[in-house]
């Protein structure tokens, strides 16, 4: 039987940011994923807030720290602190408002200006439950996502459609990148010569220092 694991016990902590225009449903995506709640009277977020949730990914406990902010221009002053340390992002637009999709490119540019090139980005078309009001075609969003090397899903925070999948996919992809980097680092350290190994003069001096002196 698996032992109890406290909420503050985790293998990795990943910061994920929600970006996109105001009113696209970022706060409801956050509350649906972290608390399984939805509010029809959700107001625009003032400033910044974040919530956390832990998931199991590849036998590791990943704690996601998900940050949410309002999309209005007047809050753009907080971008540097907001983006700092982020390893994943959900770039959200409203499938019923084409203007929010048009602004995705600007948000993506801002995100990339403030974050690591390896950041995992999921393009999210929210409010997919409003099928009769759709203004952004799925194929157009898919095409943009492919062009920019983004992941893509359509979600409904109201109906809880694909919300779990979108966050889980981002966290899984982040973990894959982190695991790959860890393996590469381990491989590099394994290549450091041990005592008795021949050391090429052309190699990095640090390798000589780590290998130790063993010549007679």
Curated annotation (Swiss-Prot):
Compartments where found: Cell membrane
GO terms assigned for molecular function: GTP binding; GTPase activity
UniProt cross-references to Gene3D superfamilies, sorted A to Z: P-loop containing nucleotide triphosphate hydrolases
Taxonomic superkingdom: Eukaryota
Chain location of the short sequence motif Effector region per the record: 42-50
Example of a GO biological process term: cell wall biogenesis
Amino-acid positions noted as binding GTP in the UniProt annotation, renumbered to this chain: 20-27, 68-72, 126-129, 156-157
UniProt xrefs under InterPro entries: P-loop_NTPase, Rab_GTPases_membrane_traffic, Small_GTP-bd, Small_GTPase
Alphabetic keyword roster: Cell membrane, GTP-binding, Lipoprotein, Membrane, Nucleotide-binding, Prenylation, Protein transport, Transport
Gene Ontology CC: nucleus; plasma membrane; plastid; vacuole
Lipidation (S-geranylgeranyl cysteine): 213-214
Membrane topology, from the record: Lipid-anchor
Xref: SUPFAM superfamilies: P-loop containing nucleoside triphosphate hydrolases
Family, per entry: Belongs to the small GTPase superfamily. Rab family.
Functional description taken from the UniProt entry: Intracellular vesicle trafficking and protein transport.
NCBIfam families: small_GTP (TIGR00231)
Name of the protein in question: Ras-related protein RABA1c
Organism: Arabidopsis thaliana (Mouse-ear cress)
Gene: RABA1C
């Amino acid at each position: 039987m698996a032992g109890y694991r406290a909420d503050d016990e985790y293998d990795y902590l990943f910061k994920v940011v929600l970006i996109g225009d105001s009113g696209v449903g970022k706060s409801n995506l956050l509350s649906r994923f972290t608390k399984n709640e939805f509010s029809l009277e959700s107001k625009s977020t003032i400033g910044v807030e974040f919530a956390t949730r832990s998931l199991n990914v590849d036998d590791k406990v990943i704690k996601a720290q998900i940050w949410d902010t309002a999309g209005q221009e007047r809050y753009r002053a907080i971008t540097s602190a907001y983006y700092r340390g982020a390893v994943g992002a959900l770039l959200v637009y409203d499938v019923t408002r084409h203007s929010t999709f048009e602004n995705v490119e600007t948000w993506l540019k801002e995100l990339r200006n403030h974050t690591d090139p390896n950041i995992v980005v999921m393009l999210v078309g929210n409010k997919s439950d409003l099928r009769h009001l759709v203004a952004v075609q799925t194929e157009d969003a898919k095409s943009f996502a492919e062009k920019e090397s983004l992941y893509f899903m359509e979600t409904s925070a109201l109906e809880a459609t694909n919300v779990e999948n979108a966050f889980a996919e981002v966290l899984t992809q982040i973990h894959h990148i982190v695991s790959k980097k860890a393996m590469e680092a381990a491989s590099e350290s394994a290549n450091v010569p041990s005592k008795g190994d021949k050391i090429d003069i052309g190699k990095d001096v640090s390798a000589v220092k780590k290998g130790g002196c063993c010549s007679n």
